[in-house]
Amino acid sequence: MGKVEDFEEHNKNSNQDIEKNVGNRRRSNSNTINDQNENINKNKAIVTKKSFIMNLLRNKEKTKVEQNDDNIVENMNERKNSLKDMSLISDNVEKDNKVKKKNSYLKNLNILGKTKSIEFSFPSNILNNARKNIQEIDEESPLTSNSLRTYKEGISEDNRQNQRNADNNSLNWSTSNINTECNSEFSNIEVKVLKTEKSNSVKLKDNIIDIPNDKNKKELQEINIKNTNKDSYKNLYLKVRNSISFNDNIKIDDENKNDKNNIIDNYNNYDDINSSNEITIDGLNHDDNIKKIDNINNFDNKHDDNLQDHHQNHVHHTFRSSRKSLGNIKSNNTNIKLNNDKNFDTNINKRSILEKYFYDIWKRNITIKKEIYSLSSKNPPNPLKSTFADACQNESSEKELLKKIPLKFNDDSIESLYVLNLNNWISSRMIIIGIVMLILSFIIWPLTTWSLKTSTWGRETYIIILFHTLMAINTLILIFFIIIGSTELCKYSECMSYVLFSLMVALWGLWNIAIGLTLEYNPNLSEMPTTTYELEMIYVLTYIYGFLPLVIIDIFFPSRTKYNWIIHLIFIFLNSSSIILVGSAKPDFVPEIYVVFRILAYTTLCIFLYIGSYTSELQIRYVFYNLLVAGYKLDKIESDMKNKTSNKKISTGIEDLINMLKECTKVILELENETDTNFNVHTKTSYCSNILEQCLSTLTKSDNLYNIDYNVLENPENKKFIEAYVSKSKSNFAGEEVPKGVDFKLNKSFSNNDCISTDKVDLDKKQIKKFLKQINISQLTKMIQFIDNKLLSDWDFNCLTYFDESEYPFFDINLSLICTIDHNIPINIIINFLCFVEKQYNNVPYHNTIHATMVTQKFFCLAKKLGIYDDLEYKIKLVMFISGICHDIGHPGYNNLFFVNSLHPLSIIYNDISVLENYHASITFKILQLNQCNILKNFSEKDFRMMRSYIIELILSTDMKHHFEIISKFRIRRENEDFDYIKNSDDLLILTKMIIKSADISHGSVSWSEHYCWCQRVLSEFYTQGDEELKNKMPLSPLCDRTKHNEVCKSQITFLKFVVMPLFEELSHIDNNKFIKSFCLKRLNSNCIMWDTLMKEEKTIEVYDPAAVKLKDKKKKKVDKKKKSYIDLTLFFIKNVSD
C-alpha cells in the first residue's frame, strides 16, 4: 500500500509540474510544427476526443498553440522514472504503454463536474500504429490548448476512481452523426471486428456487427460528424461519451512500427487485462477538408466469457462511418422493423377480428332492444309506446302481467318486444352451437365409420350409406345454424332453431329405428363384445344428435315452452318406437322390462327438461320485464333532464324570487296537512328557511331584478354573443383601458356624418309648410296599388321582393295596412304622414323603409294569427301601426353604443339611455305636431295622451337592452291567473310590446332565402360602423369587426336560439291557433340548422354591398319629380330638440 501511495504522490507532483509547464508552453511560440511533432513522437502521444470535438465546434479558435519540447520531455522522463520505482509495475509494463480513456469531453461547457478516466496497458506496437496516425493528423492540425488541458485533467484523477469507472467505459460509445436535431440516430453505428489468429501469418476477417439490431451486416458503415455549432453542446453531451488520451511511458522503437507480428508476441502481457482492442474512428470532418483518424485502445472486462475465449487473440475493432451509410443503417433497421411489425400487425389484426366477432356475439346476448317504445325525431310516436307505458304503471299483479299457461305477456306489445329480443339472443348462440357441434361431428364421424365397418353392419352397405347421408345432412344443418346467426336471417332465429332441431331429432330418431331393426343378435358369447360395441355406438348417436338438441333448446337457448314441447314429443315418440320395435322383433335381445325402463327414462328426462325450461323462461320473462321497465324509466328521466336543460329559460331575478316564493308557499301548505310532526315538519321548515335565504340573496345581489342570469348557458361563447345583441347601449369604456387618441370632450366624427348633422341646413316651420303644399296627393293616390288583406296577413309576404317590383311599395303596403283600421282620418293627412315618415328613413342597408314596412306588416300579421287583432279598439290598432312604421325612423345605420362612445349630441340629450329609440319617438311626434300630418288630431286629449304613452312605450321597447326584461315581465303576467289583455290595459301593453319586438326581429322566422338577405344587410351596417369606429380610434363594438367574419354563423345561431326563440316561445303560450309553433318556431329551427350547416362546411357569408345597389337604382327610370319635394326634417328636429 505504501508503494501505491508513493505512486499517487508522484502523480500529484507530476501534475503540478505539468501545470507549470503548460504555462510555459503557452508563452513559447518559437518552435515550428515539425519540431513539435518530433518531440511528441519521442516522448508522448496525446489525442483527446474532447479537444478534437471542441476544435470542430469552435471554428473561431484558429490560433494554434505550440508546444515546449524541452518541458514535455523533462516531465515525461520524471513520470517514467516514478513508474519504474513502483514494485507493483511488472517488467512487462516497461514495454507497454499507459492508455487513459476519459468519459468527459465537455468540461469547458460546464456540463460535467469531474473528468473520470481509466488506465490500462497495451503493447507498444499497438501504440506505434496509433502514434503514426496521430503524427499524420498533427501534421495537418497541431495540438491545441484544449488537448493539453485535457491531458492535464486526465492525469490528475484519483487512480481508485479510475479503476472504479473502468467498467463504465465501453467500446460501444456512440459516435454517430452528431446532429442535434436527431438524438436517436446516434445509436445507429456499426462495428467492424478484425480478428487476428495466433499463427505465422496474420489472418484478418471482417465481421460487421449492427449494434441496434444485434444482427450481422455485410456492408461497412461510416458516420460523419459535421454541422455542429456552439448551441449543440447540450445534445453533444448525450451523444459522445468518451474522450481518449495516449500516455507513453517508454520510448517508441521505430523498428516495431510496421511489425504486426509483435502483437502476438506481446500477448503474454495480457494475463491481467485479458484482451486488447484497437478502435479506429474514421470520418470526422472539419470544414470538409480535414479528416482525422484516432486509433485508440480499449477493453471491456464485463464480458468474461468472451474475454476468455479471446485470451490469446487480438481483436481489432474498426468504426467506419460516412454520411451515406447512416441512411443505409436506418433503412436496414427500418426494413427489419417493418417486417416484424407487419407480421405482428397481421397477427393482431386476425386476433382483433376474432375478438370483435365473439364480442359482438356476447354483446347480443346481454343487449335488450327497446325499439318498440323508442321515439324517432323524424317519425311520429310509436303507438306501442303508450301501451307499454300504461303497462309499466299497471304492474300491480302477476295475473295482469303474465299468462301462465302457456307463458305469455298479456300485453301484446311487450310480447312482441320479448320475441324480438329472443331472436337477438338465440341468433348469437346459434353460431356457438353450430361451431361446437360441427367440431364434435367431425370427431364422431370417422369413429362411427370405423365402428360400422368392424361390426355386424359392415356387410350391409346401405346402412353405411345411410349413415354418411345423415351425417352430411346433419353437417348442413349445423352450417345453416352459423349462417342464420351471422346474416339477416337472425330475425327468424327462434323459429328456425325449432325447425332445425326438430329435423335433427327426427332424422336421428328414424336412424335409431332403422339401425335397431337391422341389428343381428347372436347369443353366441364370442360375438357379445361386438354387439356391445354396436349398442354403445347407438347410444352415442342417440344422445348426441337426439337428446343433446333437447338440452340445448331447454337450457342454452331462451326458447318459449309453448313451442319447444313439439321437439320433446318427437324425441319421445321416435326413440320409444325404436326400442319398442327392437323389443318386439328380438325379445331375447331386448326384454320387455328393458323396453319399459327405456321409455320411462326418455319420458322422465324430457319432462324434467321441459319443467326446467318453463321455470327458466318464467324467470327470464320477469327479468326482461323489470329491465325493460327500468330502461324505460331511465330513458324517461334522461329525456326529462334533456328537456329541462334545453327548455331552461334565461330567467331574471324577479322570476327566481317568484318561483322560490311559490315553492315556499307550496311547502307551507303541505305542512298544514302534515301528521308526522316529529320529522317532516322540521325538514320542511328547514327547506323553507333555505328558500327564504335565497330570496334575500336575490333581492340584495342586484339593483335591477330584471337582469338575466347567464349561468344557465353552457357555452361561454353564447353569453358573449347574447350580450353583444342585448347590451348595445353600454359604453365600451366602462372598466376598460381607454384607447389612445379618443377625445372625451366631444367626438364630432359622427356629428359630421351626412345622416345626422346639425349644420347642414337651417329650416323653419314656414319652409316645411311650403314643401307640404308641393305634395301632389291626387297623383300619388292614383299611383298607389292597394294590397288584399289576406296577402298582408300572410307570414310569407316578402317585403324585399315587393320593394324590388313595385314603384311605390312603401305607400302600397302601409296605406293598405292603415285601411284595415276603421277610422275617419282624411286620406290627404295619411299620405302627408307617410311621405314625411318615408323621407326621414335614411338609405342604409338594414334600418330603412323596407325594414319599417316589414315590421308593420309582421305586427299586423302576428296580431291576426294570435287572434287578438279583432278584439282591439281601433285606437290601439292605430297605435300599433304608428309604432311599427316609425319604430326606426331616422336610424343612421349605427347602434346606440356608437352614439354613447362618440359622445354624440343625441347621446348627451338622452343621457346614454335608449338614445336611438328616444330619437325615433321624438321624430314621430315632431311629424304628428304638423297639422297636415297629424293623424291623431281627431282624438280627445285623454285618448291622445294614452296613445302617445303607448307609442313611446312600444318604440322604446324595441331597444334590445330591455329584451329579456320584457320577456320576463310578460312571463310573470302570463302565468298569473288574472292575466287578461282585453280587460287589463297593462297586460295589453306588455303583450303588444312582445308582438312588436317579435315583428322587429321576425326575419329569423321567415324563409331561409329572405332571412339570409336580411342578415347580409345587417352585417353591412355592422361592418360600416366598425370601419367608422376604427377610423375615429373608437373601441370596436361587438359584431362590428370585419376580421371576425368567420364568427357570423355562430353568432346568428346564438341570436336565433337564445334571443329570438324565447320571444316566440312565450307568445306560443297564448296562441290558441298553434301558428307560432307550427310556423315561426319551425322556421327558426330550420334556419339554425342552415347556419350550422354553413358553419360546418365553412362557407363564406357574403355581405350586402350598398354601392352595387345604388348603381342598379341609377339605371331605373326616374321617379316623379313631385316626389323630390319631400323634406328631410331630421336636421330641423335635432335643431329644435337642441334648442
UniProtKB/Swiss-Prot annotation:
Major location (coarse): membrane
Active site, UniProt feature: 847 (proton donor)
Residue positions with a glycan: 524
Reported cofactor(s): a divalent metal cation
Binding site for a divalent metal cation 2: 888
One GO BP: cGMP catabolic process
Region feature (Disordered): 1-42, 154-177
Ranges of biased composition (kind: Basic and acidic residues): 9-22
Segments in the Cytoplasmic topological domain: 1-429, 484-498, 558-564, 614-1139
Chain intervals with Polar residues compositional bias: 29-42
Binding positions (a divalent metal cation 1): 851, 887-888, 1000
Record keyword Transcription present: no
Similarity field: Belongs to the cyclic nucleotide phosphodiesterase family.
Protein name, UniProt field: Dual 3',5'-cyclic-AMP and -GMP phosphodiesterase beta
